[in-house]
């Protein structure tokens, strides 16, 4: 029953002449058809052999009772499982089919077998499609030279064959020295990580057009500040003097030391002309010097003072320091390259201020936004007359603005970014890292020449574009380093970025952990990412573990400082768990942004978001010049009026109001004359005709139109134009007369009031007379009101009497009372023999077994209608029915 071997199949006479092994598709088979036939025969033979085994049931149990059969089955089963595992492993599937527990052994093995079959059959289908031409290999659309390079997300990514230059893959690794001696320990000056604003380190100001403030001088820093308490002055005056001095010192200290020089800087005329690009020297022919001593640094400064331009770049490290460390400075001239060890010369780097602040020397940077701040933070260095190639690339609208792209575009050099994430604190530096740092500035001056030429040509042979780049570079030089300041609400900024909602306990834990991380990072001089990364801190705040082991479980890998101070963190978590569990509204309360104003239609020509002339003047308080305190419009000693509530300035009324066509009030019409625009508007309003009052007969002249005139067009026009008038025209005269009368009355009242007030002012009246006058006026008003009410009542009585006189009562008829003796009262008695109602009555009392003979028998009909209604059908409409039992 064993299947034939490939050798037997090959030696069979049916195969014919055999081909060489090199031409065979598979070893021992000349073509695919022969292999398929052989495999199919093997599968059929195996299927027949498996069918000859004892079936599951009594027969199999009987054979299983023999030890030889049991051992044979186990041996062959293991062999089959091993073969199946090899096939699974070959196709990349899970191959641990033998390592299964006894409980779910059969189900797990069957699931693995099904998954493997699916993978194999899917792969077979793909290969068959490719062989038949349905699915072909997809070739890249772009040529090799235009392929987008792979982005290096982190140091362990692989970069294979970039731009077809390197066929062999290169592995990028983060060169981080774990056991390196911290360079902060060798610094002469201790790093200031305190929670205070940054104090500039400069104490000598070369190339100064405005002297350095005395507060920044070295003598002033070394000597203690003289307090006014030492003087013979009162304590209050001493505090005032100290506040004034501190305010002036604060303004001088936190200002940019070269603010005046940069504001009055103009590029030299030589750099605003058409440049002649000077080609860079080959790297092999250019000398490279490593500056690591004070004498070499002084010599470098002298060489830089004799140059017209030089390129500068920095290498920074921020993972093992709170504020970061500038580890290396690369400087390149037209003929030499210099690499300055800034960790060794940290306290002496101020010497380079003489060349960096010289306005006659051009300093070429690329992306100097961070470099300017690092120079200020670590060395107290400032830059004047800088050209940033990154800003030039943005102005030229290049495809990319990186230095790598500029090197490829202008120099044809492929930069090696293998050491981009290296730890630059390593000493001594390897040769590869030195070459990498050198390449960043070696070609930068040639790129500077080429970009200036393109800017000159783009500006039509005018230095307009060049001046824009120098202006942007000057703005970058004006940047100041700002130290991160911790406040009680600093955690909210990070909390809003996470887009996760935390309750009161979780938010308290997040706040406490954020404060602990900031304090630990400042004390240990480590970065936030080294002490406790953001995602780990948020995970701990969400979980609120009860045990220290839970905190460690939330961190993978566990930061060293977390493992070292796990007990302190556990106490913070316990403190947060003691808080009441509420919904957090802290983050929402901090954002005090009011509701957005309603969007105004842009097609409105009169809309202006900053036009508040139409708003009433009393809506908003008048603010002071500095915008801090609202000013009172009419100051008074005793203000009895209501306090004006301050309205938020964001509630700006932006709706245009046209008051030209509004009718003036009767009181204002007599006072102020109409303007020319208002007169024109009034004439326009009078010319408008009301369509609801047109073609009405006149109220005064009730003309009769003949029926014959309707058919005559001339007479019809005549009748309409002469005898029919608008009702509005008839009503114009009485309205105008009424307005004039009201205006005259108001004017007369005001005149009498003015005369009375003038008389009172001229002749002062005593208090008793004033009270008597007030009582007299009140009595007059009451009397007049009583007379009016009496007259109104009398008029009503007259009207009633007149109506009665006009409508006499009709003659009365003979009245005959109704005879109730003939009526039938049976409708109100009810039917005593009525059947019990089929409807359920909730008021009915269930009959009890005992009978009360002494009481009177009173049977109330259940379900009958009320006695006040007849027995017939009611016309009330819907009737509520009780539910049936």
Swiss-Prot record:
Question: Mind listing the UniProt keywords for this protein, alphabetically?
Answer: Cytoplasm, DNA damage, DNA repair, Exonuclease, Exosome, Hydrolase, Isopeptide bond, Magnesium, Metal-binding, Nonsense-mediated mRNA decay, Nuclease, Nucleus, Phosphoprotein, RNA-binding, rRNA processing, Ubl conjugation
Point out the gene that encodes the protein.
Exosc10
Major location category of this protein = cytoplasm
Q: Which InterPro entries match?
A: 3'-5'_exonuclease_dom, Exosome-assoc_fac_Rrp6_N, HRDC-like_sf, HRDC_dom, HRDC_dom_sf, RNaseH-like_sf, RNaseH_sf, Rrp6-like
Which part of the chain is the 3'-5' exonuclease domain? Answer: 289-455
Quaternary structure (record)? Component of the RNA exosome complex. The catalytically inactive RNA exosome core complex (Exo-9) associates with the catalytic subunit EXOSC10/RRP6 (via its N-terminus). Exo-9 may associate with DIS3 to form the nucleolar exosome complex, or DIS3L to form the cytoplasmic exosome complex. The RNA exosome complex interacts with cofactors C1D/RRP47, MPHOSPH6/MPP6 and MTREX/MTR4. Interacts with MTREX; the interaction with MTREX mediates the association of MTREX with nuclear RNA exosomes.
Any one GO MF term held by the record is: single-stranded RNA binding
Source taxonomy: Eukaryota, Metazoa, Chordata, Craniata, Vertebrata
List ligand-binding residues for Mg(2+) 2.
313, 315, 440
Give the cofactors, semicolon-separated: Mg(2+)
Q: Where is the HRDC domain?
A: 503-583
GO biological process assignments: CUT catabolic process; DNA repair; exonucleolytic trimming to generate mature 3'-end of 5.8S rRNA from tricistronic rRNA transcript (SSU-rRNA, 5.8S rRNA, LSU-rRNA); histone mRNA catabolic process; maturation of 5.8S rRNA; negative regulation of telomere maintenance via telomerase; nuclear mRNA surveillance; nuclear polyadenylation-dependent antisense transcript catabolic process
This protein is called Exosome complex component 10
